[in-house]
Amino acid sequence: MRSVLTISVGLLFGLALSSVAHANDHKILGVIAMPRNETNDLTLKIPVCRIVKRIQLTADHGDIELSGASVYFKTARSASQSLNVPSSIKEGQTTGWININSDNDNKRCVSKITFSGHTVNSSDMARLKVIGDD
């Protein structure tokens, strides 16, 4: 009886750990160096086809001003979606989650994310870290 109880407790503990591991599926998709002059072709390519439901942006070094962002999906027609991003992100600040790929019936792989923007208030280039949640 004791061995059955031990096995049951072990299985429950294992299930609890596996559900915690899946609950936080956040991955750093990449980092973009933001130039000091306004640039509209900053591209973060996703080398492996990845379904991403939402992203967060972090200003790792320096302040950033953004004027736009788009996500591109790996499809026959290279579909894209404009994203609502904040106009400025201060150093060390992380945005809230920005939803993408909201069509749950048609799971599309993200191939790249493009940004328009630049570094402000710094002589060094700011770094924009992109975190994805699938």
Curated annotation (Swiss-Prot):
Belongs to the UPF0412 family. It comes from the Bacteria. This is UPF0412 protein YaaI. It holds the Pfam family DUF2541. Residues 1-23 form the signal peptide. Keywords: Signal.
